[in-house]
Amino acid sequence: MVICHSCTTFCILLVIDLVPCRIVGMENVENRVMFSLLDRSPQTNDTGPKPEKFEIAKGKFKVLEENSIGADTVSHLPTTREEHVSAVVPMPNFDPHRLEKALRTKGSIDGTEEALYRSLLDHTVYEKDVRPCIHHSQPTNVTFGFLLNQIVEMDERNQALTTRSWLNINWMDPRLSWNESLWSDIKAIYIPHARIWKPDIILVNNAIREYYASLVSTDVMVTSDGNVTWLFSALFRSSCPIRVRYYPFDDQQCDLKFASWSHDITEINLGLNTDKGDLSSYMNNSEFDLVDMTAVREVVRFPSDTNSDWPTIVIRIHMHRRPLFYVFNHIVPCVLISSMAVLGFLMPPETGEKINMIITTLLSMGVYLQSITESIPPTSEGVPLIGMYYVSSLLMVCLATCVNVITLNMHRNGAANQGRHVPAWMQKWILGYLATFMRMSIREPDSIALLKASQSKKSTIRRSSILRDLKRVKNMSNVRAKSKEQNANRECECMDPLVHIYAESIMTSLVSDPKPMNGSTIREDFASESTFLGRVVSDGIMPRISASSNSVLTEFETRFRRILKRVYRSLQQHEIREEILDERSRIQWQWQQLASVVDRLLLCLFCTATLFTIICLLIVPVVYRDNDVLSILNFF
């Protein structure tokens, strides 16, 4: 001990002696300076005066030539600069009293713990690669403790759970025990974990390549009876099979399996200090709620090694997902998009945007389905509820597109088929019973009813009027024939007002309906007769009729009668055409009403299907997930 103390003192003096000092009188000279050592006054005898402190020697510095490392000291020729006396100036903060106090404290330090550390870890008596045991046939009992600090991440796509945990591993090492009375009542010491033996306990279901890089270990605490406690923190990434059936309303149970990698139960007996994990320092996760955590000891026998049992500590972490994020970002948009597809049945077909709206809805559903598939694991073991709901919604939107095409064709069926009548069974069941059940009143519009009534009344009046006028003309010709001899010399200067009425009515009808009905021949006849009547009307008088002009009267009556017949025929054809157009309008209106009733029926059906899908795929499975009612889902 005295020798060690002397060596320590000499080293301290040497360090102090080599402290840089300022050199006086050596400006602009780049040379190396040799420092003088501290001189200690020699102690001649025990009775002589003892120096109370160390003094710094004073002297001149010897200057070495530049680039003369390792060479002997060379004296310079006397110059004027050497005449200046160089002095060693100590550091400003140097205190000789503090140095003396430090040396005295060093001499009074107790080295018992250091000596105990060296004696325990002496390589002649301790080998860290050898398993500690009293006899090699006895196992080393290792106690395992687990503290969960945080659930960092659940990677559903890669099926891995990342947790931050603290481990407490304890075992007995008889080689590290000592007698407290012989070592100043030292009860425990701390030793670096790399200096002693440690059990090779690892995470069996590890899912990361750099396993040991995530371990943060502290010093190992060793007590006097050989009890070793190893505390360390780690960021574990373990494989965890994800159950996606009820995603995003799912519960996940992940296991962390710890075991010795190379020692079976005959060498390392791994046990638990408690069956409940420590949650005193747990930090809540934003995505999962921790339901429960248990620790179980299992003894595993592998098929490849049936003669050995391997103790394993299984930490089961039960978590429940918080579905609020997924409800607002995945489910609510899907419900709204499905509702927009259903509301497409209420859009009038005349707008021509029903199909565009449903196709846009279908594309939106596809985009949201793609975002779902990127977040759930690509597994075929089960289909998540949200995926089933999206597929069902896509199917309903596709069906809505198909039935909207059918209803649009039905709406245009009356105009496309040139007046094809609605089948009788459709009129009876759809326009009759189904419309009544849907609380829809099928009545002809007032315009069609009034038009039909007016056309029918007008046709009756015209026909009776023409027949009456034809009879009147015939009677008039007979009367004129009888009185021809009596009025032979009388001249008729004015035309009968009835003829004016007939002529004006004929001209009005010809002007209002100039289209021919019977080809070019009828058009030529009407042209000649209209010229004749126009001349009669423009002149305002009949040609002078005398006894010698019977042929003119006969010609006029013949032409006039022929014109009336053709006018009657044209009016009749015009009425028939109007009746055909009215009938087509009525048929087209019936098809439109039929399409409206079908749209109302499909609206009710798709609303019911949408609500039924939400209840069956999103509500019932979450509420009754533990009942046998949902066993049908296992079929998929």
UniProtKB/Swiss-Prot annotation:
Q: Cite the ranges annotated as topological domain Extracellular.
A: 26-326
Provide the protein's localization. Answer: Postsynaptic cell membrane; Cell membrane
Q: Where is the signal peptide?
A: 1-25
For this protein, the record's Pfam families field holds:
Neur_chan_LBD (PF02931), Neur_chan_memb (PF02932)
Q: Which residues are glycosylated?
A: N45, N141, N179, N227, N284
- Disulfide bridge partners, by residue number: C240-C254
Highest taxon of source: Eukaryota
**What kind of membrane protein is this, topologically?**
Multi-pass membrane protein
Q: Does the keyword Phosphoprotein apply?
A: no
- What Gene3D superfamilies does the entry give? Neurotransmitter-gated ion-channel ligand-binding domain (2.70.170.10), Neurotransmitter-gated ion-channel transmembrane domain (1.20.58.390)
Listed A to Z, the keywords are: Cell membrane, Disulfide bond, Glycoprotein, Ion channel, Ion transport, Ligand-gated ion channel, Membrane, Postsynaptic cell membrane, Receptor, Signal, Synapse, Transmembrane, Transmembrane helix, Transport
Q: Which GO terms describe its biological process?
A: chemical synaptic transmission; monoatomic ion transmembrane transport; regulation of membrane potential
Q: What are the TM regions of this chain, as residue ranges?
A: 327-347, 357-377, 383-403, 603-623
Single annotated GO MF: acetylcholine-gated monoatomic cation-selective channel activity
* Record topology, Cytoplasmic segments: 404-602
Q: Name one GO cellular component term.
A: transmembrane transporter complex
UniProt lists the family membership as follows: Belongs to the ligand-gated ion channel (TC 1.A.9) family.
Chain's role: Acetylcholine receptor.
The record's section on PANTHER family has: NEUROTRANSMITTER GATED ION CHANNEL (PTHR18945)
Protein's recorded name = Ligand-gated ion channel 4
Which species is this record about? Caenorhabditis briggsae
Organism placement in taxonomy = Eukaryota, Metazoa, Ecdysozoa, Nematoda, Chromadorea
Name of encoding gene: lgc-4
